[in-house]
Amino acid sequence: MSHQEFKVVVSGAGAAGIGAARRLRDAGVATLLVEARPRLGGRAWTVPGPAGPMDIGCGWLHSADRNPWAPIAEAQGLTVDRTPPPWGRASSLVGLGARDGAEFGAALQNFRREVDAAAEAATDRAADSLLRPGDHWNHLIDAVSTWYSGVELDRVSVRDLARYDDSGVNWRVVEGYGTAIAKHAAGADVQLDCVVQRIDRRGRQLRLETTCGVITADAAIVTLPSNVLAETPELFLPALPDKTEAASGLPLGLANKLYLSLSGADEFEKESRAFGASDRTRTGVYHFRPFGRPMIEAFFGGDLAAELEKGGKEAFFDFAVAEFVSLFGGDFARRVKPLRAHGWRGDPFARGSYSCALPGRADCRAVLAAPVENRLFFAGEACSATDFSTAHGAYETGLAAADRAIAAVRASAPG
């Protein structure tokens, strides 16, 4: 087995890891960025499509007016599209009348006010306890939770949900969010197809045992998803039970996408959307003609996404077609064809989509983010106090971890 030595090793080449590696490189610190996959980006992944790039992972630059990926993408020569998202325009909603759309919007806003108020209480609780008993819109509000948090409201901490900081401005990268994030690794020393199996702290240096050999370092930054950390306690030697427990309180919810081609696309308004149903939680949300392209981006979350993932692309497609037929009639089935889907739960290096604190576990984010021995640092969206579940939240925790690592290795340098 080979042996390599660096000042800092960064484990995981998603938004957090790439951000950390770039910061360390710019500071002149010898750094290796290690990634288990054969590609960069982590849960940010853009793939080619017949009508244009498709973001299989994150696609929206949330809080875009303060999202660092917007200026990064533009500096790369990519195009940031500032068209407002379909969920921000009532006129973009297909299949739900103006009156019903307004009623649902009001119900959702009322629920969010209840969340903010309840978060001030001394005791945390599950968000489903704030739904108005018998309200017609409860199922759809719960469905929104599966897209927003990746889980139904009974598994969402009110306190954590209220802490999420969203400016309400949402943009996209025409060439793909995943493209921008992967490009930001340019110039970094990267080892792909390299799984970190153990991080041993028993010596003067850290010893990382990987599938591509042993790596020693003065410090390491771990950016692995919370589900991976929760399910592989053997990663750390000696064990870090506080980290394992914190990660288990921040499980990754599930949101999966299916892209479909659409014939006769001009019948739909650009950037419009439709709910598959308004009277049940197990439904998809469909984005028609993103960027004006002749396609549909279908989004499934929570328990529904987990069930469909077991059946692969065909199951996602069959479910979507059934909802389309109920909305637009039987002839619509002939107008769509599946292009690409990905199941994030079955992805061994993700095991889900984005983190959501369980009721009573909101403070786990700070525990997960805390350094160990001033040489083992943690980053990733689950470590963000207010921007969790986003690529910019992950990136900013990566920068913070890198700054701590830079200070640590400089403080330990002789002379």
Model-derived segments and their meaning:
Residues 1-415:
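FAD-dinucleotide binding site
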